[in-house]
From Swiss-Prot:
One of its GO terms (molecular function) is sugar-phosphatase activity. It holds the Pfam family HAD_2. It comes from the Bacteria. It comes from Haemophilus influenzae (strain ATCC 51907 / DSM 11121 / KW20 / Rd). Belongs to the HAD-like hydrolase superfamily. CbbY/CbbZ/Gph/YieH family. InterPro entries: B-phosphoglucomutase_hydrolase, HAD-like_sf, HAD-like_SPP, HAD-SF_hydro_IA, HAD_2, HAD_sf, PGP-like_dom2. GO terms for biological process: carbohydrate metabolic process. This is Uncharacterized protein HI_0488.
Length: 200
């Protein structure tokens, strides 16, 4: 049993969404497989896990390259993935145990969501799972110029919740996200190992 008291010293808590707070990854995998079939290609959804935390455009490009699909069709692939995501994700996603940490610190510490997902998907999930009130700030892929592993997402979160980045902790499930948190000068709680990693 994790003792949440280890998070007491931090000014602000910043959470990744996909795979950390909400179990969307199997749905994304299903959607990628369906998109590949639609275009007559076999997409390896393992690539999505390998590039966890990356933008959908980056993941699409890597899948297309691996499947020998011409990259000039990336806009068609992205449109198909977007449409399927809007259909599948809100109906099939559920909260992960990490959300108990959010509930535990709600109204005690400022809490931000820093995600590589687009705002529309985040808003749909917030509505479906009725969790929007738990967050003081939300930063999506649409709100930043640079994406994970760049620290911009998490630095923007810290700015919005008015917390010193070095006094924040990031909760992540993917290597790119862990790297982004450490690059932002923040401690990172890796939900896979349940350990805190420090940039210092």
């Amino acid at each position: 049993m994790l003792d949440y008291e280890i998070f007491n010293p931090y000014e602000g808590l910043i959470f990744d969404m996909d795979g950390t707070l909400i179990d969307t990854m199997p749905v994304h995998a299903q959607a990628w497989t369906m998109v590949g079939k639609k275009f007559g290609y076999e997409f390896d959804f393992q690539i999505m896990y390998n590039f966890g935390g990356a933008t959908v455009r980056t993941i699409a490009g890597e899948m297309m390259k691996a499947a020998n699909m011409p990259l000039d069709r990336i806009e068609d692939v992205l449109a198909a993935k977007r449409e399927l995501s809007y259909q599948l994700i809100p109906t099939q996603s559920k909260l992960l145990p990490t959300f108990e940490i959010v509930k535990s610190f709600h109204q005690k510490k400022p809490i931000a969501l820093g995600s590589g997902s687009h705002r529309k998907i985040i808003d749909m999930l917030m509505d479906k799972l009725a969790i929007a009130p738990y967050f003081n700030a939300i930063v999506s892929a649409d709100d930043v110029k640079e994406h994970k592993p760049h620290p911009e997402t998490f630095l923007r979160c810290a700015e919005l919740i008015q917390a010193n980045p070095s006094r924040c902790i990031v909760f992540e499930d993917a290597d790119l996200g862990v790297q982004a948190g450490l690059s932002a000068g923040m401690d990172v709680f890796d939900v896979r190992t349940r350990e805190i990693i420090s940039p210092r």
